Structures are given as C-alpha cells and as structure tokens.
C-alpha cells in the first residue's frame, strides 16, 4: 500500500502552495478532501479551457471535493465533523481567519486531539508581506 494509505486530510487551502502540498499527500496515498466555498475555488476560473481550469485540476488531482459555506453555522459544523475524523488539516487562510471559522488550532485540537494542524500562510503568521 502507499505510504500514507489510511491517512485522512481536510484540505482548506487555496492559491498554489497549499494545494500543491496536499496534492503530494494524495499522491502518497492519503485520502484528501478539498473543501471549497459555494462559488468554487478561485483557481477554477484561472486559465480555463472550455470552462475547466488546467491549473485547478493540476494541483487538485487525486482529491475528493466538498462544497461548504463556512460563513454559516451549518457549514462550520460540517467542517467540524470532517475534522473529527481527520488525521491532518491543512489551511492557507490569512492570520485570524481559521479561528473565526472555528478551524484554528485551539478549536480543531479541542475536537480532535490527535489532529495534525498545518497552517501555510503566504506571508507568515503575522501577515507581513516580504520586503526583501
């Protein structure tokens, strides 16, 4: 079996770094569930051919998908149920967003103490853009 067979990953990433990281987990056999907002991941609309984005499909191959409206209590509770059963959760929200959605490390680990919580913020935990 693949090295990560049996590992469940909740993917709350966007842009490229996070989706690439979770794509590699899927390629190694993890069961990755990509969570998208009702309007779809932003990459679905980039570089599209006949309405299908090559970029989106390239970095999300091997994943299952679910649409959740995390702006609603129902969407956040559905996310919580995914977290309950997950081994890993990866997000690429700007600082503070995961906490507002109930997906920050304290909330997620309270639901699932064995969870590996991974944050891939583009500009670090304090959201300062690089200046070098």
Question: In which residue ranges do the predicted regions lie?
Answer:
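N-terminal helix-loop segment corresponding to the beta1-alpha1 unit
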Residues: 1-132
């Amino acid at each position: 079996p693949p090295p990560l067979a049996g590992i469940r990953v909740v993917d709350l990433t966007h842009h490229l770094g996070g989706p690439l990281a979770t794509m590699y987990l899927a390629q190694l056999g993890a069961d990755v569930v990509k969570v998208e907002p009702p309007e779809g991941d932003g990459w679905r609309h980039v570089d599209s051919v006949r309405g299908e984005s090559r970029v989106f499909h390239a970095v999300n191959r091997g994943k299952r998908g679910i649409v959740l409206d995390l702006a609603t209590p129902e969407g956040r509770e559905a996310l919580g149920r995914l977290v309950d059963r997950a081994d890993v959760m990866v997000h690429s929200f700007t600082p503070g967003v995961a906490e507002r959605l109930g997906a920050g490390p304290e909330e997620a680990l309270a639901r699932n103490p064995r969870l590996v919580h991974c944050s891939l913020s583009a500009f670090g935990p304090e959201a300062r853009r690089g200046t070098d």
